[in-house]
Amino acid sequence: MIFQIFSALLIGFLIAFAAIPFLIGYLTSRGEVGVERSGKHGFGVDTSGKNGTPSMGGVTFILSSLFATLIVMFLFRLDSLNIIFFIVSFLSFGLIGLIDDALKVFYHRDEGFRFIPKLIAQIISAALITIILVAVHIPDKLTFPFFRALPLYFLVQFIFYLVWFVGWSNAANFVDGIDGLLAGIALLIFAGYGIIGIKENQNLMVIFDFSVVGSLLAYFIFNRPKAKIFMGDCGSMALGAGMAINAIFLQHPWSLLWFGLILALDTTSVMIQVLVYHFFHVRVFPVAPLQHSFQRAGWSEWKIDSLFWTIQLIITMIGVFVWIK
C-alpha cells in the first residue's frame, strides 16, 4: 500500500506541476485574467495587487488527481466501480464551477453563473451522485455521533446526501479567497481521510485522496502568497464535493463536521452575518467569511494562512487519532 500511496502522490504532483505553468501561460498570453474593477475588494481590502492573475487553476488539480488515480489503478490492477463516485463528484461540481469561471474570465461577466441557475445545477449534480450512491453502494442506515445507526428511507437518504454535497461544495467556495488558504486546508483534510482509508482498507479512497494531495502540493507552489494563479470556483467546488464523497464513502458523513470544521464555521459566519443584518441591520462580524475579518484588521495573507493551517492540522491530527483508536 505504501508504494501505491507514493505513486499516487508523485503522479498527481508531476501532472499538476507540468500542467499549471502551461495554463498560466495560455491564459496570460490571451489576456484572459482576473482583474479587480477597483482598488478595494468587496470585503474592504485592497486587492489591486492581484490584478492580472489568471484563474481556473482548479482544472489542473481536478484532472491531475483523476488521471493519477486511474493510472495507479491500472498499474496495480485495481478494479472497482466505486471510482465512479469520485469521478462524478469531482467532475460534475468542478464543471459547474468551470462554467462560472469561464463566464467571468472569457465573457467578463462579473457575477458569473447567476445564483439560481448555479444552485439548480448543483442540485442536479448532487441528485445524480446521490442516486448512484443509493442505488449501488451506500447502505440504508446513517450513523449519528454517540447514537446507534438509524435506518434511512430512500427519500430521507436522498435529501440528506443532496444537502451534504451542495452544502460542502459551497462551504469550500466560501473559504477560497485568500492565496493558498483553501489549498492548504483541503490538502490536510484529504490527507486525513486518506490515512483513515488505510485503517478501513478502502484502497481506492486512499489512492484518490493521495492523488489529490499530490496535485494540491504542486498547485500550492503556484498559489501560495503572492499567487500566480487562482483555483476559481471550479477548484473550490470540486474540493468540497470531494470531501463530501469521502465522508459518505466511509459511511460516516458527520465526520466532515469535524474535519471540515473551519469550512463549517466560515459558512455559519456568513449565514449569521446575512440574517442578522437583514433583520436588525447590525453586523455581527467586521467581515464575513471570517478570514477576511483578519485581513481587514491588517493581517498579511501568510499570517492568516499560517493560523488557519495550524488549526486545520490540529483538527486533522485529533480526528485521525480518535478514529484509529
Swiss-Prot record:
Its main location: membrane. The keyword NADP does not apply. GO terms for cellular component: plasma membrane. The chain crosses the membrane at residues 5-25, 56-76, 83-103, 119-139, 149-169, 178-198, 203-223, 228-250, 304-324. Signal peptide: none annotated. Keywords: Cell cycle, Cell division, Cell membrane, Cell shape, Cell wall biogenesis/degradation, Magnesium, Membrane, Metal-binding, Peptidoglycan synthesis, Transferase, Transmembrane, Transmembrane helix. Its cofactor is Mg(2+). It is an enzyme of class 2 (transferase). Its EC number is 2.7.8.13. PROSITE patterns: MRAY_1. It is found in: Cell membrane. Pathway: Cell wall biogenesis; peptidoglycan biosynthesis. It is a multi-pass membrane protein. It comes from the Bacteria. GO terms for biological process: cell division; cell wall organization; peptidoglycan biosynthetic process; regulation of cell shape. One of its GO terms (molecular function) is metal ion binding. It catalyses: UDP-N-acetyl-alpha-D-muramoyl-L-alanyl-gamma-D-glutamyl-L-lysyl-D-alanyl-D-alanine + di-trans,octa-cis-undecaprenyl phosphate = Mur2Ac(oyl-L-Ala-gamma-D-Glu-L-Lys-D-Ala-D-Ala)-di-trans,octa-cis-undecaprenyl diphosphate + UMP. Belongs to the glycosyltransferase 4 family. MraY subfamily. Catalyzes the initial step of the lipid cycle reactions in the biosynthesis of the cell wall peptidoglycan: transfers peptidoglycan precursor phospho-MurNAc-pentapeptide from UDP-MurNAc-pentapeptide onto the lipid carrier undecaprenyl phosphate, yielding undecaprenyl-pyrophosphoryl-MurNAc-pentapeptide, known as lipid I. HAMAP family: MraY. PANTHER family: PHOSPHO-N-ACETYLMURAMOYL-PENTAPEPTIDE-TRANSFERASE, PHOSPHO-N-ACETYLMURAMOYL-PENTAPEPTIDE-TRANSFERASE HOMOLOG. This is Phospho-N-acetylmuramoyl-pentapeptide-transferase. The gene is mraY.
